[in-house]
Design a protein with these regions (language model features):
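Metal-dependent DNA phosphodiester-chemistry modules and their immediately adjacent helices/loops
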Residues: 30-74
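Charge-patterned, long linear interaction tracts outside catalytic cores
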Residues: 71-99
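Residue-level marker of regulatory loop/turn positions in helix-turn-helix DNA-binding domains and
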Residues: 89, 93, 112, 157
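Core structural elements
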Residues: 1, 92-108
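Charged/polar, low-hydrophobicity segments characteristic of intrinsically disordered regions
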Residues: 62-80, 153-162
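A generic short alpha-helical patch detector that favors 3-5-residue windows
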Residues: 24, 92-96, 115
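Conserved motor-region signature of P-loop NTPase helicases/translocases
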Residues: 1-48, 106-111, 118-151, 155-180
């Protein structure tokens, strides 16, 4: 609606919901996780497909799906990824978990996506928290992530200049200047 002919100048149409702030919905976070899964098990076709898909979604959205999912051919698959990632797989896998995360962000240039920076920072905080509380193990982190990914989101202040979409259960007890209840 924001970009339609019916949008009125001077009005903001930004919307925020709990689901839109979840880390598992961020493209950059999913690319990081795909790269981590691939480093953990390069022979896993699903890990290769996920990495290929997430990379194409961010950097090559016009690329045909037949090319994106042609992951059985290792050389073709790796030719589409950054050279620094493909040639240093062995040394990347040996890095401590937090350092691996930062290195992958740098290799894939994920910090260049301004709308995703809050998600990356929140994900890095989770990695650091896991690293300091649990252990420095990529496999354990990925397992923990699968169990907890739906609970992790970017925290925003109440001063966000956007319409907040809440369920009645989440909104119970809260006060807002304006409330819209659809029927």
């Amino acid at each position: 609606y924001k970009h339609s002919d019916q949008a009125k100048p001077g009005f903001d149409y930004d919307v925020v919901s709990n689901e839109s702030l979840r880390l598992d919905g961020a493209s950059t976070v999913n690319l990081l996780l795909g790269a981590m899964r691939y480093l953990l098990n390069p022979d896993d076709a699903i890990a290769r497909a996920q990495l290929s898909y997430e990379f194409a979604k961010l950097y090559e959205p016009e690329r045909p799906f037949t090319d994106v999912f042609a992951v059985t051919n290792h050389s073709f698959f790796e030719s589409n990824l950054p050279l620094e990632f493909t040639k240093d797989k062995g040394s990347l896998k040996k890095l401590p978990l937090f350092e691996l995360t930062e290195t992958l962000i740098s290799i894939f240039k994920l910090g260049e996506h301004p709308g995703e920076i809050a998600y990356l920072l929140a994900f890095q905080n989770l990695v650091l928290e896991f690293y300091s509380r649990e252990r420095n193990d990529l496999g354990a982190f990925l397992e923990w992530w699968e169990e907890n990914k739906g609970k992790k989101s970017v925290q925003v202040s109440g001063e966000v200049n956007a319409v907040q979409i809440l369920t009645i259960h989440k909104a119970k007890g809260l006060q807002f200047k304006y409330v819209i209840i659809p029927f």
